[in-house]
């Protein structure tokens, strides 16, 4: 910790030791920005004021939860679009409900494992790389302090338009707090974030796997119910209609959530995601139907 007692955990330092990310409500700040509501923005930047105005006395923990929300939303979108397209292609090829289920469930499990493992590998590699760069920067700050300070002076003057005197003063002050200086340098020089309370690679992989499985299972739910009611040889048309309704509705909800999460227009994001799923399903159905016609014609000719 810095000698002054001011804390740093990935946000901007404030006088009482909290970080900026902990003394404001980021979700409320984003909502206020969407509405261009100045008073709501001011309230969101003061957690105490926000609680006084709303009566909400719960602690605000945004860093880790945001990572989980991201994994759930994007993993869910991948899962439902992928499996819905597979289901549509199978129905277009005139497969029975049981055949659609076999193909769909097999792909669901395989794709979920692939997505979860890919997220784990990607997160682990990113974490290792950032840690290695942090250790290098710490070594350089310890052994080549003047060179590191000069780099930051150049960044302030060239990137942000500081005068050389102000840049030098800024560097001299921040260099007293080595942990802050290293983290700040990693952001400005390397574009790397370090010091946030992020989920472990294993947790990120498991969340991605679970989200893909859960949302990917929704297009198959109608087929599971249809087979349970009418047997393995049941026609797939009505089950596919149910899958279409469930999938498009879920895509709309996930798209809306994605828009809220990334600060886009939620309704526009919802419509785009629903359109994406609809287009993927339509193309897959068309290809399946075409292949069924070609294969059927060849079998008849034979």
Swiss-Prot record:
Residues 92-99, 233-235, 298-302 are vacuolar. The keyword Membrane applies. Its main location: membrane. GO terms for molecular function: manganese ion transmembrane transporter activity; metal ion binding. Disruption phenotype: Mild growth defects in cultured parasites under normal conditions and more prominent defects in replication in an iron-depleted environment. Lower number of parasites per parasitophorous vacuole. Accumulation of less iron and/or altered distribution of iron within parasite cells. Parasites are more susceptible to iron and cadmium overload. Parasites have lower cellular iron levels and increased catalase activity. Iron overload leads to reactive oxygen species (ROS) accumulation. Decreased survival of parasites within macrophages and decreased virulence in a mouse model. GO terms for cellular component: vacuolar membrane. The chain crosses the membrane at residues 71-91, 100-120, 212-232, 236-256, 277-297. It catalyses: Fe(2+)(in) = Fe(2+)(out). Induction: Down-regulated upon treatment with excess iron or iron depletion (at protein level). Transcript levels are down-regulated by excess iron and do not change in case of iron removal. Residues 1-70, 121-211, 257-276 are cytoplasmic. It is found in: Vacuole membrane. Fe cation 2 binds at residues 137, 148, 151, 185. Vacuolar iron transporter involved in the transfer of iron ions from the cytosol to the vacuole for intracellular iron storage. Plays an essential role in detoxification of excess iron. Important for parasite survival within macrophages and parasite virulence in vivo. Belongs to the CCC1 family. This is Vacuolar iron transporter. The lineage of its organism: Eukaryota, Sar, Alveolata, Apicomplexa, Conoidasida.
